[in-house]
């Protein structure tokens, strides 16, 4: 099994610790884990040039950074996004990377194998609930077609890993073991979700109409995949 992990921060703090603990329960010795640390491994800020939409993702100014991450996600059964809770949201570095993935949304040029993957979003905070952060990251994966995204949150009551209490450490480990079991179970039985199928059919209808499909690049993609006809990405 292959796992892609995208860290929304460069430092190895509490959120990083959570992810590593989950991986200890989730990954087997022969599994392949590819990790990307932002901003180091990510692109510079998206400038909204629309090149990825209109011309192709390979022409994006940040393609040399974006496409290796995309390739890893494509080859993985499980995709993990983690980010500390920054002002009730994902880090700016993570959001910037998600901006570069916009062309892969179901509205544009989704890829078939994303409909069979499993996602996990992870966030921690010192006090305020980080639920919005994990939901926001999960939304990004779902719009790329990922049918099931699990969410892991932890209110650490600490500023860094050295000040986290033993009680919180135990809570972290217990929650990590539980969610790793769920993720592994789903990864062994991948299938598209009803919501994902509904979204697909909504935008299939749009791409089927030359008048409604405003971007020829997107429409050509749907035609090439056979989705305008009888082919479906989850089969």
PLM features per residue range, with description:
Residues 38-58, 160-165:
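N-terminal beta-loop-helix "entrance" segment that forms/cooperates
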Residues 147-235:
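Glycine-rich phosphate/pyrophosphate-binding loop and the adjoining helix
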Residues 7, 37, 152-153:
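Residue-level recognition of beta-strand->loop/alpha-helix junctions
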């Amino acid at each position: 099994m292959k796992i892609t992990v995208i860290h929304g921060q460069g430092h190895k703090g509490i959120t990083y610790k959570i992810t590593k603990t989950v991986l200890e329960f989730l990954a087997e010795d022969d599994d392949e884990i590819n990790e990307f640390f932002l901003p180091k491994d990510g692109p510079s800020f998206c400038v909204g040039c629309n090149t990825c939409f209109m011309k192709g993702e390979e022409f994006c100014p940040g393609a040399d950074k974006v496409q290796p991450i995309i390739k890893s996600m494509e080859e993985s059964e499980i995709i993990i996004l983690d980010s500390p809770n920054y002002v009730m949201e994902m880090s700016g570095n993570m959001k910037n990377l998600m901006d570069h993935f916009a062309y892969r949304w179901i509205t544009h040029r989704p890829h078939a194998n994303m409909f069979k993957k499993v996602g996990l979003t992870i966030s921690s905070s010192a006090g305020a609930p980080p639920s919005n952060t994990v939901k926001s990251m999960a939304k990004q994966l779902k719009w790329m077609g990922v049918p099931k995204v699990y969410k892991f949150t932890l209110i650490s009551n600490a500023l860094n890993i050295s000040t986290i209490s033993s009680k919180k450490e135990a809570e972290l480990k217990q929650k990590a073991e539980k969610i790793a079991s769920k993720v592994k179970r789903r990864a062994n039985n991948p299938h598209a979700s009803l919501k994902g199928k509904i979204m697909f059919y909504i935008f299939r209808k749009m791409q089927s109409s030359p008048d409604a499909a405003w971007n020829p690049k997107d429409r050509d993609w749907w035609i090439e995949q056979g989705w305008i006809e009888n082919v479906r990405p989850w089969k």
